[in-house]
């Protein structure tokens, strides 16, 4: 007799699509050197002291600090936010999940502004919430009036990526304040803060509904160690700390973050290099008649293909050892996203694109 395990699975997850992550470099079938431009990582890598600390680390047999006390102290110095308002997690993804677990009852609504970071929708639906999409305009700007019209008594959260991923679009502090003035708990995702220098931290005392997320994956070269943090009103930080699994920031990540914060000026210099390279990449991409690059304030550039198929271009680049992200969702049909790497990475990408356009 066949045992039917499926009947025990949550019915709302039967058709859950899951998340399509970037392909791991070791899975790419090519003999060429990989240029990885698909996940918005810092290709300069971690600070030298981080690499040294990881090479010398010998405490893997010990559980990490469950409260991340030293990391939070260093982050308090960095952000100017009190230690008790800071919560660390396994990437900002975990904090998104925890926020939704904390706020959402089945059927509660979350306002989302697509195209945007896919994990807002992913975790909302995983936690039995209802996504209410308020699409951006043709330039990928947020429609604040439409957000206001979408609010109902069931609205529990609004997610705003500042700047937006995957479009790179900026949003002004005044626009964010207009959203906060609507009175709904609002999560401002500042994953790319170090590339813009714009933050809502100074507004936290004025807006008790403001929550800020950040990550070490983009600017600090630590994507593989999965560390993010959030800045929250004290009551929310307390609740999140209660429901968060205690050892979510592993001991190697803990050590790496400590070194990163001590060497942050070094890492911020690499950020400056990436910002400069972003402008060069945008200028050069604009010269291809078949590509339309969108302005970006992050560490990537989104391009729409004016002719040809994005998926085919992605595959052709992969065959040359260059990994990029392809999008074909509503409002992002036939688009590619290029992370900004080192100058030699840009050179390799431009050379490959030039050969394809010949």
UniProtKB/Swiss-Prot annotation:
The question of whether Cell membrane is a record keyword is answered with: no
Biological process according to GO: L-histidine biosynthetic process
- Which keywords describe this protein according to UniProt? Amino-acid biosynthesis, Aminotransferase, Histidine biosynthesis, Pyridoxal phosphate, Transferase
Q: Please name the gene that encodes this protein.
A: hisC
Q: How does it assemble?
A: Homodimer.
**Alphabetized PANTHER family for the sequence:** HISTIDINOL-PHOSPHATE AMINOTRANSFERASE, HISTIDINOL-PHOSPHATE AMINOTRANSFERASE-RELATED
Its cofactor is:
pyridoxal 5'-phosphate
Kindly report, in one word, the top-level EC class recorded for this enzyme.
Answer: transferase
Q: Which CDD domains match?
A: AAT_like (cd00609)
Family assignment from sequence similarity = Belongs to the class-II pyridoxal-phosphate-dependent aminotransferase family. Histidinol-phosphate aminotransferase subfamily.
| Catalytic activity, as annotated | L-histidinol phosphate + 2-oxoglutarate = 3-(imidazol-4-yl)-2-oxopropyl phosphate + L-glutamate
Pfam families cross-referenced by the UniProt entry:
Aminotran_1_2 (PF00155)
Q: Return the protein name.
A: Histidinol-phosphate aminotransferase
Concerning SUPFAM superfamilies, the annotation shows:
PLP-dependent transferases
Which is one GO molecular function term here? histidinol-phosphate transaminase activity
N6-(pyridoxal phosphate)lysine carried by residues: 218
Which biological pathway? Amino-acid biosynthesis; L-histidine biosynthesis; L-histidine from 5-phospho-alpha-D-ribose 1-diphosphate: step 7/9
EC?
Answer: 2.6.1.9
